[in-house]
């Protein structure tokens, strides 16, 4: 059985998708042609034969996209069908459409690039809110996102949107834009690894169920001043390992952790979040008190340790009522740095709604305990309370992929962490849809 090896922080996979083709190189990239050249009575059910491309052979029941494609309407991956997207494919979503483009995954998605050839989801105008996102269904069993760039999503759905019709995201109502990636099957599983989520108008991710590993990703420049936006928004029904991610400029929170939605069939969430780097988060308008860096509510009980919070609006926070399950959580030690006196005050002991631990490492004066990133430029006008998405008024600079958030030699952040905690998936997660792929190109036959 092939598994994601999170112990070694290696999450590599490959997948592919185009139109159904029988044992031949697939030249057709029409994403709406669910059958081989259409009309064989197999609509929306995947191929009846093995699909062979230059990269791999894919099992019966597959869709395979091998080349770049442009979407002008939403695509639905049916239950029981697996969509594979091969390395290097770019999916461009058109923005000038009546109903925002969504990719609704009722079946499985294996969207796996490589470091040299990432899979890219973008838009034609490259502006936030140009399209919706990847929205998964209640029967979606497996999703793999490896070396994937996802940008410019977050559009608000309409009643004609697939996500609304399938009652997938906030069922039965329209409440702002959809996340760039949403997973909801309590019994399903997903992995997000080595990927770059950026410039999405609302939440980068939103989880209401599922077993997942989120590792080695960058989440940058999410949300908007009017509606906010989290990088990682977790409700009840999840089991998650979240590690080694960089979260930059999340408008509201890097993490919003909650057990909202818990029921007889939706269990309380279990989560281990560790070794994450959180920078410049929480600048959104002050009328929403949840803006900050990490918000824990409704009996959430995460393991949240060894994380670095850098120049974010607040420290760890919870509401006055219905906050974290403090008895069953582990929320310390973490490392908090502030380069301004305002930042120091807003994460200090006694700060409104703050959760304080003496075992945390915190700046007590501006600039103290600088973790010394290898390469990072902070805005000269940086203001943790700016409340407007304007660099001139103190909002964060746009993310620069040349920045390096590893620590320099001698950094005070190189010590003080702990190792006496457990991951949820110490041996990784198996993805059976990948086990069925026979790679023909050794450069793309990835270890997972």
How would you describe each model-predicted region?
Residues 1-11:
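Bacterial N-terminal signal peptides that target proteins for export
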